[in-house]
A protein has these predicted regions:
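Non-catalytic, well-ordered alpha-helical segments in soluble enzyme domains
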Residues: 304-328
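A cross-kingdom feature strongest in bacterial/archaeal respiratory oxidoreductases
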Residues: 4, 37-40, 45-83, 197, ...
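Anionic-ligand anchoring segments at beta-strand to alpha-helix junctions in alpha/beta enzyme folds, i.e.
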Residues: 1-24, 176-206
Length: 476
């Protein structure tokens, strides 16, 4: 079971429902002339930030007197939003309303005529309620900015729209609407790379992870191996992860170099080499192999996890993980000769350009499916104050929070180091009577936390935002 807290479930499901592909294709962002992001923080935590930072730079660079236009629509301004030509602050959860409003505008302007007639008719019918007036009222963005974004899209030659990766209100519907927009503007999806799909698509769904730990509580399992994963911290408090790990009949082995919340419950802890201490390979995308080598030597006597498994294999060949890795990649025909292997090591992997299949055809979708998805979109919260926990550029989901240098590095937007403040709009602060650096307590059914207030216009009024990552109980 592959556990990844950010498993992009909404994005994968939307791709399955609209595109007929349950996976995470890559995007040729560098080839777009207009880019619209609805909560996709691709410069920080979304899919492959290093890859998309490079592609965004190419898309946004001045070329022959022109540069691409980038609009970011979200409830708070992340680093990605701060780099946008236009940031639209919307109420949390209304990104789907905005996306469907853009669908309605695109259809009204005559786009989408190359789509199958039945599909175009269904999209047109389901988008009727999402007029500009309705979207502006629901989302809180201005009519002027909505028109500006819609005009940019409808006049673009190669527009690309991307949706949120992390769970949020109406995330599935947002990503479905995003896929519809891309189909309307380009039925062949030429800016999608279906061959070079992101490997994180192999991550298990949250329901599968919960069911896995439920089975551990009910079935006679006697051994559980955990490799550098911390579900106790990342899974919801009401899940049965802790109960499963505390089962007396279950022997838990944690391969980890740090004592995190999950490792603290293990019966046996086996520290393993860090990535810069060992030979290994990782394929972040299909068709790509990135090689690791012990550039730092061996900092400790800890073994690589590959050698641990080979030792438990009864002494069968190969006798170490380096030889196994060589044989494994050769059997997969990644190279043929020892010289080719040396070249692979020198260049850090095997990188072949992927080309998408040019014969993509939109699947047939029943009209009733669209109505089930979009007729009952959740409206914005009517509570006086809404709380958003968002991925952290410094700590990701919390797995980097024990690195002192990451704590010491200031957040790129707030310039605050060592701690995580609560971001609050000046209007909200005035209403609540808060001042800069006031300590506030945030309380829910599962716990409470205290944090200082940071005033910023980069969040929508009526919400407070805090980055995920700190707050560990065990993570040395």
């Amino acid at each position: 079971l592959v556990f990844e807290p950010y498993a992009y479930e909404a994005l994968k499901t939307a791709n399955e429902k609209i595109l007929g592909i349950e996976g995470l294709p890559a995007y040729h962002m560098d080839k777009a002339d207009v880019l619209v992001s609805l909560g996709a923080d691709f410069l920080e935590t979304w899919l492959s930030p290093v890859e998309y930072a490079r592609k965004f730079k190419a898309m946004h660079a001045l070329n022959r007197g022109r540069k691409g236009f980038f609009c970011h629509i979200s409830a708070y301004q992340s680093l990605t939003g701060a780099n946008a030509d236009l940031w639209l602050s919307c109420k949390p959860g209304t990104e789907a309303h905005v996306a469907m409003g853009l669908v309605h505008q695109a259809i009204t302007s005559g786009r989408g005529k190359n789509l199958p007639e039945s599909l175009l008719s269904s999209i047109k019918q389901v988008s009727l309620p999402f007029t500009k007036e309705a979207v502006v009222l629901a989302s809180g963005i201005s009519a002027e900015n909505f028109d500006r974004t819609a005009t940019r899209l409808t006049t673009a030659k190669k527009p690309l729209i991307v949706g949120p990766g992390s769970a949020c209100g109406n995330a599935l519907q947002t990503n479905m609407a995003v896929n519809l927009l891309n189909l309307i503007f380009d039925p062949q999806l030429m800016l999608f790379d279906f061959e070079g799909r992101h490997r994180v698509e192999t991550a298990a769904r949250r329901s599968q992870v919960l069911a896995f730990f439920e089975r551990l509580n009910q079935e006679p399992v006697d051994l559980l191996l955990l490799n550098n994963t911390n579900p106790v911290f990342s899974m919801p408090w009401e899940s049965t992860v802790i109960e499963a790990l505390k089962q007396k009949r279950l022997f838990v082995v944690s391969f980890s170099s740090f004592m995190d919340e999950t490792t603290a419950l293990a019966d046996l802890v086996i520290p393993t080499r860090l990535p810069l201490e060992t030979w290994d390979e990782y394929s972040g995308r299909r068709g790509m192999v990135s090689t690791l080598q012990p550039a730092m030597g061996h900092l400790t006597e800890a073994p690589s996890i590959g050698d641990v498994f080979l030792c438990s294999n009864g002494g069968k060949k190969p006798d170490n993980y380096t030889k196994y890795l060589y044989r494994h990649l050769k059997q997969k025909k990644k190279f043929e000769t020892t010289k080719a292997w040396a070249q692979t090591i020198q260049q850090g992997g095997i990188f072949k350009q992927n080309h998408r299949t040019p014969s993509f055809q939109p699947p047939e979708i029943e009209p009733v499916f669209f109505h089930k998805a979009f007729d009952n979109l959740l409206l914005p919260s009517t509570s006086e104050l809404a709380f958003m926990a968002v991925p952290s550029i410094r700590f990701f989901d919390g797995r980097g929070a024990n690195r002192p240098w990451l704590c010491e590095v200031p957040d790129p937007l707030t310039k605050i180091a060592w701690q995580t403040p609560v971001l609050m709009h000046p209007q909200t602060m005035k209403t609540k009577g808060f001042a800069q650096e006031d300590m506030v307590e945030i309380q829910s059914e599962t716990g409470r936390l205290n944090a200082p207030v940071y005033e910023t216009e980069g969040v929508h009024p009526g919400i407070i935002v805090m980055a995920i990552g700190q707050g560990h109980q065990n993570f040395g």
